[in-house]
Every structure is written in C-alpha cells, then in structure tokens.
Amino acid sequence: TASWKSYKSGAHFANSCFVQIHPTCIPVTGDHQSKLTLMSESLRNDGRIWVPKKKEDAQAIANGTKTALDIAEDDRDYYLERRYPAFGNLVPRDVASRASKERCDAGYGVNKTGQAVFLDFSAAINRLGKDAVEARYGNLFQMYEKITAENPYVMPMKIYPAIHYTMGGVWVDYNLQTTVPGLFAAGEANFSDHGANRLGASALMQGLADGYFVLPYTISNYLADDITTGEISTDHSAFEQSEKNVKERLDFFMNNKGSKTVDHFHKRLGKVMWEKCGMSRSKEGLEEALAEIKAIREEFWKEVKVPGVQNSLNQELEKAGRVADFIELGELMCHDALSREESCGGHFREEHQTPEGEALRNDKDYSYVSAWKYKGENQTPELVKEHLKFENIELKQRSYK
C-alpha cells in the first residue's frame, strides 16, 4: 500500500493501535468465513440488544432446541440498557462491542460459535407498526434475511462485533505534510482527524476537507519556490533504485517455489490480530502476537506461492504485495498497543480497566500521539511522542452510565 511504502521510506506512522470495532455485524458461522457482514449502526436506533439471563437458555438456542421467541421477557438481559441506563443501546461502538464480547465470553452467546447476541425489533414493531419499521430498515432487513434465511420481523437478528476502521495512519502536520519533505498524505491515509476514536462520516469529512480545502493551498505554497523548476529527469539514481526494488519484489513472488497460498497467510494473520490485538488486549497476548506474526512473516517469504503471470492482470500477485505489508503493519499495531499502558477509545488493555470493566485512561502519562519511525527490516520501530495540547476544551472522560 502507498501508506506503508511511505512509512518504510521515512514517513512516521501514527496511532496504529486505535481500531474501531463495529458492534452490528452478521456473525460468521465457522472458520470457513474470513469476514463478518457489516450492517448499519442505524439499527440500534430502534433495535434492543439482549442475551438470555440463563446460560442454559443460551446453550439451548445455540444447539437449536429453543429460539429467541421461547425466552420470556423477564428472562432476557438487555445488558446495554442495564449497564448504561443513560444511553442504553445507543452507547458508542467500542462500548457496545466490548459489552457484547463480555457476555459471549461469559457463556451467553446465542449461536453455535458462541459469538452472537440478539438485536430485537419486536418492541419497535409493536410501538411504531411494521410498515414504519420497514420504511426505515427494509433494505437492511432484506439483506439480513437473504444471508441468514431468518425473518428479522419475526425472529430477532443475531449480531456480533467486527473490525471496521483504523483511526491511525501516516503522520501529517497541519499542512498535511508527512515527515518526508514534499510528501503529503490526504484523506483516510493519514491519522489527523480522529484521535483514539473515530469521528462520524469520516470519509466524506476527510475527502472534502483535505482534498478541497487544505491541499490545494498547502501543496501550492510548498511548490511556490520551485515554479521555475524544469522537468525532473527520471534518470536519477533514486528512480532507478525504486524501479529495481519493485521488479525484484515482483520477480520473487512469481518465481518463489512455495506451497501455500496468499490467502493462507492472510487468514492466519487475521486470526492472530483478532484474538490478540482486537477488542481486548493484554501484555501477554500482544507479546504472543508479535512472536506469532514474526513466524508468519518468515514462513510467508519462504512458502508463499503466487499463480499466474506477471505482465498481465494478476489479482493474486497484487494480493501478495498487500499481505506482505499487512504482516508488517500487524507487527506495528502490536508494538503500539503494547507501549500504550492504558485503555482509551478503540484501544482496550485488560490490565487497565475499572472494577466495572470500563476503559481506564491514563491521561497523565499517555496524552500523546504515538508516531512510529521505521528502523529497518526485523528492527523494532522507534516511538516518537507528539504531546497533545488542549487549549479551548478541558480533557475529560465521559460516562455513559
């Protein structure tokens, strides 16, 4: 990816540990699936999230001897409404996601994998009528039924959290320039707008703000002194070296006599990241993840096999280059998460939580942007701290109770 090439060329990469989890996704049914299907967060406006209060009921639903309709109202745990009475089912995504994970980890999951909770629209249908609910969510209900073969107007949806968005990216200054002079990063490629949690409508916001309001002025200003500079020759040694590196990489992928597909390594990496650098992280888990990713990287470069030819459209070749970058990005995310000894926004460390299981921030020691500098192959990156300054607002922690 361009972002990763920028990082390896000297641009700092910032806040990679802050990852947004989307709580409203259709669960996977087994290891054969690599992704969860994203539903809209608008569903939580009217849907109520719950699991059975009794583990035996959850187990009965999971094995098919009961359904959600068999669980009496008094035997349902609307856990977001219970834990967060002020916000209920409308708590932020990271809070809702962790609460769902906690219930499922405790044994109250309602599908065969144990990783699903109910999103129930029966109260909304009774209150508003089916036609009103269909007018709001009909396309989403149709998509859900097509995937699961269950009618969400009758049977509560099953949902589970999934990775959705990364708040981190290439570090940029106020002018959107990276630490490499003359290299600018715009839109979701940079880190600049979000902090520890994602702001809404970010693609539209960053695309418009960076591309329409900022870059036309900052790049023009940067290039103003070079307005009379002539055409740059591509005979420069930097061009030759870059072209040589790309050709060598492509030749390697096409000629390597490995025995495993790119997808094999991609799936292994994803499993490690989800289990040990996902919704919940720990020192032990992150250190294990770093060791496992190192092993995946070493095996990838020995055993990856890319079919097809080089000089025509080859999606497997394109994918191989991306997964090679993903492996290194996964390592950086683990380093960042390991270094941040607090729970904040999309980053939750199990060692740093309140007695009620909520995120425990450490503003005194970690109120900074974590910008990482590439130090070379197989070398631990260098952490560069950009301390945050709050001039017009006071730094506070929100409560959703």
Where are these regions (language model features)?
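C-terminal amphipathic alpha-helical interaction region
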Residues: E299-K401
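Short beta-alpha connecting loops at secondary-structure transitions
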Residues: Q33-K35, H194-L204, L250-M254, W274
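Long, amphipathic alpha-helical stalk/connector segments used for oligomerization, subunit docking
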Residues: N221-S312
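An anion/pyrophosphate-binding glycine-rich loop and adjacent beta-alpha core
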Residues: H12-K146, Y217-S220
